[in-house]
Every structure is written in C-alpha cells, then in structure tokens.
UniProtKB/Swiss-Prot annotation:
Residues 285-318 are annotated as: V3. Glycans are attached at residues 81, 131, 135, 144, 148, 175-176, 180, 190, 227, 234, 255, 267, 278, 284, 290, 322, 330, 342, 370, 381, 385, 420, 582, 588, 597, 609. It comes from Simian immunodeficiency virus (isolate EK505) (SIV-cpz). Residues 433-441 are annotated as: V5. One of its GO terms (biological process) is positive regulation of receptor clustering. Residues 26-656 are extracellular. Gene3D superfamilies: 1.10.287.210, Human immunodeficiency virus 1, Gp160, envelope glycoprotein, Single helix bin. This is Envelope glycoprotein gp160. Residues 678-835 are cytoplasmic. InterPro entries: Gp120_core_sf, Gp160, GP41-like, HIV1_Gp120. Residues 545-563 are annotated as: Immunosuppression. Residues 634-655 are annotated as: MPER.
C-alpha cells in the first residue's frame, strides 16, 4: 500500500514538473532594432570624383555638376562567415552608369553647333600635300571640297572650302562606275543628326566613384577569379566603388581593372564573352603630321571648324601594341578551348565600322583601327611591337542614342596617347553541333561598365528584426525613450553580420547607435563636402539628386521609427511583446538552434515569408494594448472626487439626469405592459373585444367539472373578433404571450446553466483544495522523512565522534602514564641491581 502511494506521489510530481516546463517554454515574438540584415535593392547612387572645375575637359565639367569630392579616407569592413549571391548580368548599377555616361556625352555636346546647314552639295577633288616630297600612296584619303554656305545674313551666301576624309563623305552619283565623281555630300545627311563637338573640350576620362546613399550599402566580393555570377564567400561592405574610368572603346577594354591571379572569362550564357586580363598590355596610338584648323561661318552664331591644310606626312594613323599580347591571347584561347571544343577564332566578320574596328578616342580624334593582326595566327616573333593601321573619322555615329552623330573638330599638331589593354570583348556564333566561331565585337557599352562593376551590388539595410524570445510584455507602463547617441562608423554596423544571433544581440544597442550615427555621419560628410566645394559645384539637376540622397536616409529612419511606434517599441533596441511565437514560422527549429547556430541574415531569409503575418499580429496586439491602457487611464479619474464638482462637467451631469428620467419612464411603461400581460393570462380582456364560442379541448388538457353543475365542461370560451382594432389587439396579445413564454424558457435554461456552472466550479475548487492538501501532505511527509534522516545521520555521526574521542583520550592517558612511570621503573631497576 505504501509503495503504491509513493508511485502515485512520484507520478503527480512528474506531471507538475512537465506542466511547469511546458508553460515556461512558451516563446513570444521579440522585436530587435539594429540587427545586421540587408536585402538586395535598387536605389539612386551618387558619384564622387576628383574633378577640377577650372579644367575644360568634358568629363570634368560633368563630374563637377554631378559628383561630390572623394572621401580621403575610404572605409572597407570585412564581413566574415557570410556568403552572398552576385549576378553581374542583372546589376542595376550598370544601367545607372550607362545613363550617367550618356548624360556626360549629351551634356558635353548640348551647347555645341548642329551641322545640319552642311548638308549641301560638295564639289570635291583629290588633295595632295604640296609640302611633302615623299611619294605618297595615301593621298586620296583626303578630298578638297568647296561648297556654298549662308553668311551672317541669311539671304547672302558665299563659297568656302575644306578638307574632308573620304570616309566622311559619299558621292551623290552612286551609279557612276568610272570613279571620277566630283560631287559629294556628308555621310550622315540622310540618317543621323550630327553635332559638332565644342572646340575647347576633349574626351580624356577621369575616375568616377559610385557611392551608396545613407541607409544603403555596397557589398563587394573579394574572391579571386570570381566570374561575377553565383555565391561569393569573401565579402565586405564599402561606401563607394573603386575609381572607374569611363573609357569608350570597342573590341578591347582600355584602362580598366585587372584580375588578381588568372585570366577570367565571363559568359552571360547567350553570345558574349568578357575577358579580364591579369596583366595590362600597353597600346600607344599616334597620329603623325600636323593639321591646321580653320573656321567657316555657316550661319548666324554658328562656326564650322574645318581642316585647312596638313603639313608633313599624311599617312594614316596607327597604334602599336606590345608583343606580350601574343602570349596573353594564346593563354586566353587555351582557356576558351578547354571549356568548348571545335572553336575557330577569326577577326570581326563585318558590320558597322565601330564594331569591325577598334574604335577609340585619342586626343580628341576618333581612331578606327584594324585589329586583324591581333586575332589571327601569330608569326612567333617575340621582338618589336604589333602595328595596327588606323583611320581617322571626323563624323562618328554616337553610341548613346540611335540616329545621332558627332563631328570631331580637327586637332592641331601631332597626337599621341598611351593606354593599357585590360580586357577583351568577344562574341560567338554556333553553327552545327558544338561548332563555335569566336570574334571580337563591341558596341554595347554596358559591357565596359559590367566588367568593372561585376563584384559590387547594392543592398538596403533592414535594421528591424523579429525573433522568438522567452520574455513577455506583461504590463503597460510608461518608460523613458532611449536616446541613441552618435559615434561609430556606419560601415561598422554590418561588421557583426557573420556572428550568430545570440552573439550579435549582445551588442544590439551599440548596433542601433551605429546605424543612426552612420546615417547622420554620411549625411554630414556629404553636406560638408558640398559646402566645402560650393564654389566648384554648379547645382543643377545633379545637385537635386544629391539632396534627394540626403532626404532618403531621414525618410527611411522615420519609417522605421513609425513601424516601431505602431508596435509599441519606439526608441527601444529590444522590445518584448505579448504575441505568441508560432513554431511553423521558424520551420520548427528549436530556440537554442536559432540563437546558437544562425546569423541574422540566415534568420531573415527563413522568416521573410511570414513577416507580413507577424507584423500584422504585432499591430493588433499594440492596438489592444492601447485600448487597455486607455481604460486603465480612465480609472484614474476616480482618484480625485473634488473634480466631480467642476463646472465643466455639469452638462455631463444633466445628460445623465435626462437618461435616468428616461430610463424610469421606460421601466414604468414596461411594468404597465407586464401588468397587462399578467391580466391577459388570467383571462381578462375588454368585453367589447371578445365573443365566446365553444372549442374542443385538446387531448393533453383534462376536462374539468363545475362544482354545482352535473354537466361536463366540454369547451372553453375563445374570442372571435372583428374589426381592425380588435385584430390588432389580438395579435399584440398573442405576440406578448409568445415573447413571455420564450423569455421564461430562456431564463430557466440560463438559471439551470448557471446552477451547473456553479456546481462545476464548486467541484473544481474542491478538487484543487484536495490537491493542495494532498500536495501539502506529500511535502510534509517528505519533509519529515528528510528531517528524520538528517537527525539519524547527526546522531550516528555524534556517536562515532564520541567513541573515537574516548579511544583517543584513553590512548593519550596510557602514553602519559607510561611517561610518568619511567623514573619509577629506573629506580626499581637500580634497586634490583644493588641487591
């Protein structure tokens, strides 16, 4: 019996412990502000450059209006233990740079002269330099043309002459097979609108840095030989990209960035191959000879700059490429062959001159160079340079817009420019089964920017996060809002992104401060840069763009604070709520797994699909809490009775008085109606409204017999009424009877339900009391057992200690007596010896 009772006690204890554990393990939604989480985003980037306003160079003019000065101390923060996906072929930064470079060119050409008046008949003849005694074979490349133009007065014309390259004019009579054409026109007149480049500008680019506005960041991939697509394991966050030179070219990429180790080939899985070299190859372009530039008035306020004469050698321009090209090109071909079989490398098969040739701008002149020597089989010569023959064109089709062209005014004196080849643009076509033909191409300038921006992506900082927590918001109390201080760098905010959620949450307040202070710091830096260079900055649409970047950060911060306010978490870095956490939101992961093994970035990806549901529940909970808080605050009005006599509340008292009087009148009317109903039940009704007719009793009602009559009462009187008022009264009476019976039934059911509820509650309380008494008995029993065991233990210990003490005392006494008896034993021994 005792064993059974002990088993029962242990079972109850286990059940209680399990119940306490279940109740204690319930998780609640906790809001965190300042978590290192980001998401892919598209936003307006602003640019920085080392532009000089006093320079007349075209890019400097554009950069002065569009860019702020560069940061002298750029920051880069590594993010350990983070893997990020990149896609260079779907990068909004490339599209933005494309639009910006188009704006650069269009702004540079906007104030320049349109050459529409030059679409006239040109009378041309072959030109030969009179100052050059060398036998020249290329003299036919220039034509000496005369034509009529409008003078300063629109009704007057005059005849002028100019030298044109053969590539810039075409004969009017295209059917003449003799080749003795004398009448020409400009090549663009039937296709594009040509603008003459302003004479005081050049096209030498300067590095441009693209920067993310506050509230956003640029993620950079630092993996070696990264192909621009897929996952990157070594990432960092920066505020600006490296300096990118907007060099316009085809076939070859000039003055770009180099690969860190091996040659990297990037493919968009369509028909484009971007090759990034691991070492630069010098290319030196030269236009020998000396042009003299004249000017012709072609209308009021319009000047056409023409070539008057060429002094010296008139041979074509050329570019010299270092012989190391052959080795690098052979390595590149081998890498491509290893990935694809049956490959044939050829020069460009044909098309626009800008695509079939290497088109670059050198010193203001547009060079069109034949690159066949670069992409055909090499002769094995390892000395000297590779010389590319080039042609100069003054009328060029612009790559920025279809149907637009540019006339490059002639440049005086010799021209020479040195660049570095850092990449190649290749295209391939597939013929048959696994047969590829690869050739150099160009024209799509986005590939130039994509080669530089492949390792960058823009992300938006999402500092608000939700996660399960063990704490619950129990009471509604007023708390002082924490004020975030200023201090750390904004980029350091993402430094804890690779840490686990538990480790990152320890410094959450610091993270939140970094977020806000970083936003403020970025804006202050931007504003100080603008103020410091306000004598250089010419505010235009680009200035408005900078101001928009500043306003965007404040809008994002205010939006976050508004969301936190809707949840009752304004000004808090960690906010507890009373919304239960649903384990399905976290894929049934345990609390320890979430906080010990996952980063905030991984956690955000897991619960992102449930964010809307969680946020909605947080808003509903806060609304309910606001209602509860309002009700609680309304109870405070009872604390001061003296305010009841305030004159401002008299109208409220009058309203209450009217409501009480109306209630009394209503109760009186209801009592009268109830009295009438009671009388109706007793059989009373106005005589004028009733007529007695016999009716047969139902089987459920027994017949009654009158006391002084011997006849049975076979019926009772019912009313047979006629007339509107009588019918209305009868209907009203029946309605009241029906309502009375139903109300009586409902009241009886309610009374019975309340009685059962009272009995069940009483039984439950009795069971709880019995359980309490039983548990108290168990606790008392085990307490007594523990007390008895302790007493027995103490008694046993005391007895053992006493016995040991007695033995020790007895031993000490024996030793002492032995020592005391030593003289006696000596004396007795001496006595025996003397006897």
């Amino acid at each position: 019996m005792k064993v059974t009772e002990m088993q029962k006690n242990w079972l109850i204890c286990c059940l209680l412990i399990g119940l306490i554990k279940i109740i204690g393990s319930e998780l609640w939604v906790t809001v965190y502000y300042g978590v290192p989480v980001w998401r892919d985003a598209e936003t307006v980037l602003f640019c920085a450059s080392d532009a000089k306003a006093h320079s007349t160079e075209a890019h400097n003019i554009w950069a002065t209006q569009a860019c702020v000065p560069t940061d002298p101390n750029p920051q880069e923060v590594l993010i350990p233990n983070v893997t990020e996906r990149f896609d260079m072929w779907k990068n909004n930064m490339v599209d933005q740079m494309q639009e910006d470079i188009i704006s650069l060119w269009e702004q540079s050409l906007k104030p320049c002269v349109k050459l529409t008046p030059l679409c006239v008949t040109l009378s041309c003849s072959s030109w030969r330099s009179v100052n050059n005694s060398v036998n020249q074979t290329n003299h036919v490349q220039m034509q000496n043309c005369s034509f009529n133009v409008t003078t300063e007065l629109r009704d007057k014309k005059k005849q002028v002459y100019s030298l044109f390259y053969m590539g810039d004019i075409i004969p009017l009579d295209t059917n003449n097979s003799s080749g003795n054409n004398s009448q020409y026109r400009l090549i663009n007149c039937n296709t594009t609108a040509v603008t003459q480049a302003c004479p005081k500008i050049s096209f030498e680019p300067i590095p441009i840095y693209y920067c993310a506005p506050p509230g956003f960041a640029i993620i950079k991939c630092n993996d070696q030989d990264f192909n621009g697509t897929g996952e990157c394991n070594n990432v960092s966050t920066v505020q600006c990209t490296h300096g990118i030179k907007p060099v316009i070219s085809t076939q070859l990429i000039l003055n770009g960035s180099l690969a860190t180790s091996n040659i990297v080939i990037r493919n968009n899985s369509k028909d484009t191959l971007l090759v990034q070299l691991n070492e630069s190859i010098p290319i030196n372009c030269t236009r020998p000879g000396n042009k003299t530039r004249g000017q012709v008035q072609i209308g009021p306020g319009m000047t056409f700059y023409n070539i008057e004469n060429i002094i010296g050698d008139t041979r074509q321009a050329y570019c010299e490429v270092n012989r190391t090209w052959e080795q690098i090109w052979n390595t590149t071909k081998q890498i491509i062959i290893n990935n694809r079989k049956n490959i044939t490398f050829i020069p460009n098969p044909g098309g626009d001159l800008e695509v079939t040739n290497l088109m670059i701008n050198c010193g203001g002149e547009f060079f069109y160079c034949n690159t066949s020597q670069l992409f055909t089989n090499q002769n094995g010569n390892t000395t000297g340079n590779i010389t590319l023959q080039c042609r100069i064109r003054q009328i060029v089709n612009l790559w920025t817009r279809v149907g637009k062209g540019i006339y490059a005014p002639p440049i005086k004196g010799p021209i020479n420019c040195l660049s570095n080849i850092t990449g190649i643009i290749l295209d391939y076509t597939k013929s048959g089964t696994e047969k590829y033909t690869i050739y150099p191409t160009g024209g799509d300038m986005t590939n130039l920017w994509r080669q530089e921006l492949y390792k960058y992506k823009v992300v938006s900082i999402e500092p608000i996060g939700v996660a399960p927590g063990k704490a619950k918001r129990h009471t509604v109390t007023r708390q002082k809002r924490a004020a975030f201080g200023l201090g750390a760098l904004f980029l350091g905010f993402l430094g804890a992104a690779g840490s686990t959620m538990g480790a990152a949450s320890i410094t959450l307040t610091v993270q939140a401060r970094k977020l806000l202070s970083g936003i403020v710091q970025q804006q202050n830096n931007l504003l100080r840069a603008i103020e410091a260079q306000q004598h250089l900055l010419q505010l235009s649409v680009w200035g408005i763009k900078q101001l928009q970047a500043r306003v965007l950060a404040i809008e994002r911060y205010l939006r976050d604070q508004q969301i936190l306010g809707l949840w009752g978490c304004s000004g808090k870095s960690v906010c507890y709520t009373n919304v239960p956490w649903n384990t399905t939101w976290s894929n049934n992961n345990s609390y320890d797994t979430i906080w010990g093994n996952m980063t905030w970035q991984n956690w955000d990806e897991q619960v992102r699909n449930y964010s809307g549901v969680i946020f909605g529940l947080l808003e509903q909970a806060q609304e309910q809490q606001s209602i509860n808080e309002k009700s609680l605050l309304e109870l405070d009005q009872w604390s001061s009775l003296w305010n009841w006599f305030d004159i401002t509340k008299w109208l409220w008292y009058i309203k209450i008085f009217i409501m009480v009087v109306a209630g009394i009148v209503g109760i009186r009317i209801i009592s009268i109606i109830m009295s009438m109903v009671a009388r109706v039940r007793q059989g009373y009704s106005p005589l004028s409204l009733q007529t007695l007719i016999p009716t047969t009793r139902g089987p459920d009602r027994p017949e009654r017999t009158e006391e002084d009559a011997g006849e049975l009462d076979n019926g009772r009187s019912v009313r047979l009424v006629s007339g509107f008022l009588a019918l209305a009264w009868e209907d009203f009476r029946n309605l009241l009877l029906f309502l009375y019976h139903r109300l009586t039934d409902c009241l009886s059911i309610l009374r019975r339900t309340l009685e059962l509820l009272r009995q069940n509650i009483h039984k439950g309380l009795q069971l709880l009391n019995e359980l309490r008494i039983y548990l108290w008995g168990i606790i008392a029993y085990w307490g007594r057992e523990l007390k008895i065991s302790a007493i027995n233990l103490l008694d046993t210990t005391a007895v053992a200690v006493a016995e040991g003490t007695d033995r020790i005392i007895e031993l000490v006494q024996r030793i002492g007596r032995g020592i005391l008896h030593i003289p006696r034993r000596i004396r007795q021994g001496l006595e025996r010896a003397l006897l």
